[in-house]
Structure formats: structure tokens, C-alpha cells
Curated annotation (Swiss-Prot):
It holds the Pfam family AA_kinase. It is found in: Cytoplasm. This is Glutamate 5-kinase. Residues 277-355 form the PUA domain. SUPFAM superfamilies: Carbamate kinase-like, PUA domain-like. Its EC number is 2.7.2.11.
Length: 361
């Protein structure tokens, strides 16, 4: 059912490479015109929009004729560095026609690793939104370390959606949504319940031609966000008026229904896979206490059998069983050194407080 007024007040719009590039791999002016016009219309209706866009590398392909023997990493760096200028200008030139200013933010995964850095970044976004400026975000491919690169911009959009406590994350791809491959005709699945887990049965083989992400990545990010209280839509960005349809409650693509929102720090921890600076190994008794669901339980030193890495208070750490299975993630309440000296002992303060603990479903 469509509504006269938008059902969301703050959204992230993630635009995939295959949405804004044509078959020749170059930026598609008509699609860019459409998307920026839709965003401008939503802003006029009072919706705050954060734009996460891929496409810098593809834009670079339309500018640079590479020569010499560059490694794949060097090639990506050159194309991203040159293409990002064209990409941001393509958006800003169009936003200007609507009286809107865009701001470029290039980030790396490491920017989300430190809590204080994370909070500083959030302050910047909030200030831009307060001034009615559109944050235009992309991964800083030119300087990103391979080990700390995002899986793709779907992951980046999820981190930003969580950080800014948005109402919805709209992931625009070049497909209509998640298809039900188990049903005749393979219809688009309109809604996904937060309890759904096995998405691979609905995924068709293949992935984006120029981008790094596929539908399974999108579903996993969407599922995690929905469990954190953020609605996620996966839809076709080339469909005319797609953002208006979704923002006003109309049916389009696949909607991942949100659960009750979680606390800010819990959201940060929940999306911190790959950002951890160490790990604690816990025994079965601690696992049972954390996962019983009977009451809120912090991770105490008595249940810890090992400590890995060198982390400080406030760093993200991984929680593992003795056989290496990841149980969850948490924000350390002490240093690795103190955790080692305390492990196995009773009556001491938690190594990870419940409010800063996220268990893998």
C-alpha cells in the first residue's frame, strides 16, 4: 500500500556499479539523472538521504588507457583514483540542478575499527544531514589495504546504515530482487522474515560483471541489518521511480522486515566482522551461559580459556569456542594483557559487557 507521505525519514541508498553503467562500462547519464531527481524529490519531502555509490573503477575505465605492467591492485588504484573524480562530479552536477549540495566521503574498513574514529565519522555525517547536504560515500579503493577492503559496497552501506540509525537501507542492483527459485516461474520474493537463514537456495549462480558483490552478499547484509532493527530493500535501480515507490510504502523488490532496534553500541559490534583486533577462547560453560537466552549475560573471565592478539580496552574482539567456531563479537572492557591475567578466575569484572556483546545467530 502506497502512502501520500514517505514512510521513512532517514535512508541509505546504495547504488551498484551495474545500475549506473551501461554495457560499455561507462556511466549512464539517463540513470544518473533519474536517481538524483528521485533523491531530490525525497529530500523535498523531508527525507534524509545518504548515498553510497560504486562505479569509480568503471568511470576510470572511460578515462584512462593503461599502459605497462600494472598489478591488479595497481590497476584498481589507478582506475579508482581517476574515476572517483568523474563519478562525484557526475552526481554533484546533477544535484546542483535541484539546488542540492553533495559532499564526498571516501572511507576504508579501518575507519570503522576504532570506536572514537567511528564516532567522529558519525558526527560528520550528522552535521552534513543537518545542513541538508547529501553525503556521497564510496570506498577509498586508491588506498585501501587488501586485507581491510569491504566485501563490496553492500557491506559499506550496512555499516553506515547501522551507524546513522537509518529507517531503511535501499540496495539498488540491476535485478528486481531476490527470486524464489523453488517456485514455478521464479517470482520475486516480496518479504523476508528476520528468522530466515538459508538464502543460498534462492540464489542464482553468477555475480556482477564489474562489482565485487553478488546477491548472497546482499542477502546476508540485509538479514543482519533487519535483525538490528533496520528495514532493507533490494530492488532494481533502473526501474523508473523506484525510490519513490519504496519510500512511500509501495511494493517493489524484496523487503527484509526489521526486528526491534538494538542499542547503538550493539549495532556497531554486530557489523564488526573483519574489524576485530584479537580474540578470546571460551569454554562450553560460558557458551551455554551466553546463548541460553534466559537472561542478559556478560562474558566473565572464569569462562575464558585463551586470549589471542594484542587489543586495548574499547577494541572489537572475536569470541570463539575451543574448536575455533565463532560465537560472537564484543567490545573489550580491558586490555589483552589483563584478560590473560584474569582468565579462569571467579569474581572479576566482565571482559565483555552484555551491552557490548553480539552473538552470531
Amino acid at each position: 500500500m502506497s502512502h501520500q507521505h514517505p514512510v521513512y525519514r532517514r535512508i541509505v541508498v546504495k547504488v551498484g556499479t551495474n545500475v549506473i553503467t551501461g554495457r560499455n562500462g561507462k556511466l549512464d547519464p539517463a540513470i544518473l539523472d533519474s536517481l538524483t531527481s528521485q533523491i531530490a524529490a525525497l529530500m523535498q519531502d523531508g527525507v534524509e538521504v545518504i548515498l553510497v555509490t560504486s562505479g569509480a573503477v568503471s568511470a576510470g575505465r572511460g578515462i584512462v588507457s593503461l599502459s605497462g605492467n600494472l598489478t591488479p591492485v595497481e590497476t584498481r588504484q589507478v582506475l579508482a583514483a581517476t574515476g572517483q573524480i568523474r563519478l562525484i562530479n557526475a552526481y554533484n552536477d546533477r544535484f546542483k540542478k535541484h539546488g542540492i549540495t553533495g559532499a564526498q566521503l571516501l572511507v576504508t574498513k579501518g575507519d570503522f575499527r576504532d570506536r572514537q574514529h567511528y564516532l567522529n565519522m558519525r558526527t560528520c555525517f550528522e552535521a552534513l544531514l543537518q545542513q541538508k547536504i547529501v553525503p556521497i560515500v564510496n570506498e577509498n579503493d586508491a588506498v585501501a589495504i587488501t586485507e581491510l577492503m569491504f566485501t563490496d559496497n553492500d557491506e559499506l552501506s550496512g555499516l553506515i546504515a547501522s551507524m546513522l540509525q537509518v529507517d531503511a537501507n535501499i540496495i539498488l542492483s540491476n535485478v528486481d530482487g531476490l527470486f524464489d527459485t523453488q517456485s514455478e516461474g521464479n517470482p520475486v520474493i516480496e518479504e523476508i522474515d528476520p528468522g530466515t537463514k538459508n538464502f543460498s537456495q534462492y540464489i542464482r549462480p553468477g555475480k556482477s560483471e564489474f562489482g565485487r558483490g553478488g546477491m548472497l552478499t546482499k542477502c546476508n547484509i540485509a538479514h543482519k541489518l533487519s535483525r538490528l532493527g533496520i528495514t532493507v530493500h533490494i530492488a532494481n535501480g533502473t526501474t523508473p521511480g523506484i525510490l519513490q515507490t519504496i519510500a512511500h510504502g509501495g511494493k517493489a523488490g524484496t523487503k527484509f522486515i526489521a526486528q526491534k532496534p538494538k542499542q547503538s553500541r550493539k549495532r556497531w559490534v554486530a557489523l564488526s566482522e573483519g574489524l576485530e583486533k584479537g580474540a578470546v577462547i571460551i569454554n562450553q560453560g560460558a557458551i551455554d551461559a551466553l546463548t541460553s537466552g534466559q537472561r542478559a549475560t556478560s562474558l566473565l573471565p572464569v569462562g575464558i580459556t585463551g586470549v589471542e592478539g594484542s587489543f586495548q580496552r574499547g577494541d572489537i574482539i572475536r569470541i570463539c569456542s575451543t574448536d575455533g567456531k565463532v560465537i560472537g563479537y564484543g567490545m573489550a572492557s580491558c586490555t589483552a594483557e589483563k584478560a590473560r591475567s584474569a582468565m579462569g578466575q571467579k569474581g572479576l569484572k566482565p571482559v565483555i559487557h552484555y551491552d557490548h556483546l553480539y552473538l552470531v545467530p
